[in-house]
Design a protein with these regions (language model features):
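Structural core segment of the AMP-binding/adenylate-forming
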Residues: 1-10, 17-18, 321-323
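Conserved ATP/PPi-binding loop(s) of AMP-dependent carboxylate-activating enzymes
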Residues: 198-202, 210-243, 279-281
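Gly/Ser/Thr-rich phosphate-binding loop
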Residues: 86, 111-116, 125-191, 204
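Conserved AMP-binding A3 loop
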Residues: 25-49
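Conserved S/T- and glycine-rich ATP-binding loop of Class I adenylate-forming
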Residues: 24, 30-33, 66, 72, ...
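Conserved AMP-binding/adenylation subdomain of ANL enzymes
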Residues: 48-65, 73-113, 127
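AMP-binding/adenylate-forming catalytic core of the ANL superfamily
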Residues: 106, 114, 227, 232-233, ...
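Conserved pre-ATP/AMP-binding loop-to-beta segment of ANL
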Residues: 11-29, 36, 59-65, 201, ...
Length: 347
């Protein structure tokens, strides 16, 4: 790992440059319908607007202390840090996620807010110190980036009833938040816990049919979002940009529906991607790794529900007639070409 002092010592000082507004602030990589990463161009204005839109729900001020434990190369934690900075809150940065260290840091630094993916929350709940750890300073936990198992959410609410929970739904193309489910909604319980919440103050959300018409309440369609936080487009991908960005609306590739009270429910993903432990796994990459095995004739990779990771990578494999390959063989074959979290957990 690199530290700030090393970077400063070994690199020349950059020439000061004034940038802002609609100029590009950064390129954040994400997956899409093709299964290949795409660079999402976000402007300074979009990132600022997203942070402002999150402030009412995050409820931070200058006394707040925000913990960065989720990977900071993801837009989610980047946006959380923006909201903290706009609130004049303190940013507490951890080098990596370790449950023991997280509990120690929360207690020592009097952390008040944190963004955690559901897999992190489950690891914390399963830790031997979960029941005795000092979480008294914590005010809110924001979660998202992958499906939250109902059992994990119930355990979290039971163990830490004083902590307000906020679910954030969105994607990198939205810098990244589109809707939020409030702490009050969590405490109400029931069916609402399956919802992704309501739109933030800065954006509009619709559910549309294939012809672009608004779907009726309770009828599913594609979720589309419009606001000052939407992307500029995909880096060097004009065709993909045209498909995803229409008249200012970002077509998310997610299927959802609204209830009569304006709460959004995500019912499926249209995009060819599995989200496991908050990380995106492109199924085509896993399929390509498996199909290169000499015994494999055909393969399809899907995501299946998983209590710890939200989703797990599952491979359906057809072997050539007369060939044989065990699950261990296929796992070892994948390990040579793709990251560990992308390897199928089951076959």
């Amino acid at each position: 790992a690199l530290d700030a002092e090393t970077l400063i010592r070994d690199h020349p000082v950059s020439t000061p440059s004034s940038r802002g507004g609609e100029e590009m602030a950064g390129v954040f990589y994400t997956g899409g319908t093709t299964g290949f990463p795409k660079g999402v161009m976000q402007s300074h204005w979009a990132i600022w607007a997203s942070g402002m839109g999150s402030l009412p729900m995050f409820g931070m001020d200058r006394s707040s202390r925000y913990l960065h434990v989720a990977p900071m190369f993801h837009m989610a934690d980047f946006a959380g840090g923006m909201a903290a900075t706009l609130s004049a809150a303190s940013n507490i940065v951890m080098q990596s996620f370790d449950p023991t260290a997280v509990y120690q840091t929360i207690a020592a630094e009097k952390v008040t807010h944190a963004l955690l993916v559901p897999a992190m929350i489950k690891v914390l709940l399963d830790h031997p110190n979960a029941a005795t750890a000092d979480m008294s300073s914590m005010e809110k936990i924001i979660y998202g980036a992958s499906p939250m198992p109902a059992a994990t959410l119930e355990r979290c609410m039971a163990l830490w009833p004083h902590i307000g929970l906020v679910q954030a739904y969105g994607q990198t193309e939205l810098a990244p938040v589109a809707t939020m489910l409030s702490p009050e909604d969590h405490r109400a319980g029931g069916q609402i816990l399956k919802s992704a919440g309501r739109p933030t103050p800065i954006n509009d959300v619709r559910v549309v049919s294939d012809d672009g018409a608004d779907c009726a309440v309770g009828v599913s369609g594609e979720v589309v979002v419009k606001g000052p936080h939407t992307m500029m487009g995909y880096w060097n991908k004009p065709v993909e940009t045209q498909k995803a960005l229409k008249d200012g609306w970002v077509y998310t590739g997610d299927a959802g529906l609204f209830d009569k009270n304006g709460y959004l429910y995500i019912v499926d993903r249209l995009k060819d991607m599995v989200v496991t432990g908050g990380e995106n796994v492109f199924t085509t990459e896993v399929e390509n790794a498996l199909i290169s095995h000499e015994a494999v004739q055909d393969v399809s990779v899907i995501g299946i529900p998983h209590d710890e990771w939200g989703e797990a990578v599952h491979a359906i494999v057809i072997l050539h007639a007369g060939s044989s390959a065990s699950e261990d063989d296929l796992t070892a074959h994948c390990r040579a070409s793709i990251a560990g979290y992308k390897i199928p957990k089951s076959f």
